[in-house]
Regions:
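Glycine-rich, proline-tolerant flexible connector loops at the mouths of alpha/beta enzymes
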Residues: 35-57, 71-78, 101-113, 160, ...
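Catalytic cores of alpha/beta
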Residues: 23-27, 77-92, 136-151, 187, ...
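Hydrophobic faces of well-ordered beta-strands that scaffold small-molecule active sites
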Residues: 13-19, 36-38, 65-69, 101-103, ...
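Alpha-helix-loop-beta-strand connector modules within alpha/beta enzyme cores
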Residues: 47-73, 112-134, 167-192, 228-254
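Active-site mouth loops of central-metabolism enzymes
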Residues: 9-21, 69-85, 130-141
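Acidic (Asp/Glu)-rich catalytic clusters
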Residues: 29-30, 55-66, 91-96, 120-124, ...
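N-terminal amphipathic alpha-helix/helix-capping segment at the start of soluble metabolic enzymes
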Residues: 1-18, 22, 60, 252-254, ...
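Glycine/Thr-rich beta-alpha phosphate-binding loop at enzyme active sites
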Residues: 100-112, 134-175, 211-231
Length: 269
């Protein structure tokens, strides 16, 4: 099914903020974000599954919450024990009020783990399922996207295989074209406010960023880990939302400079 024409004057690009606490979720809401992805240990591990107590606290903030389901750091190939934990965590997160989950896995030879994916999608039911950045570790992203489409996945979070999504614009545009409105492409991975216009021109449906700043701990000691943690910066969130709205409107109206409102791949160096 192709994406229906957007009847609005502007193309609406959603902004999702990666958060690790309820205060950051409140910041995201106050600054205009559309939803949050909730995880733990983002900077240290790339993100792992948060506690159910934290899920409940963030759900209470009022924004749609999409919970990362990843049992450990260190890649995306999961054994039987980890798969069982992931399925339990999906059910627990949804029972705690999450709007959806963010998860997935790969086979050892670098393809989408379709058996695990089918189980995760089934456990998610009618809630939203986003395939996470494991897609950036596959050998063939377009083939991986086809596997996600076949499994009924609704959204994928990707940098286009680049370290930073802003450097993966051409690949993201290819994914958008391949998806053809059947699945949302959400750009994420090192996203800065300055990169957002180019990402919107690539045709992505949503922008994902942490918009974080460092908070130095008041007191630490042996065994306490790093002496700082990350929280959402309201000014950065607001700037990202404004950039996405402005770029979406300009793409719709064909007002971007240098012909940049046409084919996004034409402007990629």
């Amino acid at each position: 099914m192709t994406r229906p024409a957007d009847p609005s004057p502007d193309r609406r690009v959603a902004v999702e903020i990666a958060v690790q606490d309820a205060a950051s979720a409140r910041t995201a809401r106050a600054s205009g974000a559309d939803r949050v992805e909730l995880c733990s240990a983002l900077a240290a591990t790339g993100g792992v599954t948060p506690s159910i107590g934290l899920v409940e606290a963030v759900v209470a903030v009022g924004l749609p919450v999409h919970v990362l389901i990843r049992p450990r750091p260190g890649g995306f190939v999961h054994d039987a024990d980890e798969r069982a934990v992931m399925l339990r965590d999906v059910r627990a997160a949804l029972a705690a009020g999450a709007a959806g989950v963010v998860s997935g896995g790969l086979t050892a030879d670098g393809r989408v783990d379709q058996d695990l994916l089918a189980r995760l999608v089934d456990a998610t039911g009618d809630a939203a399922f986003t395939f996470h950045r494991a897609i950036d570790a596959v050998d063939d992203r377009l083939a991986a996207l086809d596997a996600l489409l076949a499994a009924g996945v609704g959204r994928v979070l990707t940098s286009g295989g680049a370290v930073r999504a802003g450097d993966g614009v051409a690949a993201l545009a290819d994914l958008v074209a391949r998806a053809d409105g059947r699945l949302e492409i959400q750009a994420g991975g090192g996203v800065t406010v300055e990169a957002i216009p180019a990402l919107v021109r690539a045709g992505v449906d949503a922008i994902h960023l942490s918009a974080r700043r460092r908070m130095v701990a008041a007191r630490v000691g042996p065994g306490g880990g790093e002496a700082a943690h990350d929280v959402a910066d309201g000014e950065v969130v607001a700037a990202a939302v404004a950039a996405a709205r402005e770029a979406g409107g300009r793409v719709r109206r064909g007002a971007l400079p240098n012909g940049e409102g046409t084919d996004p791949r034409d402007t990629v160096g």
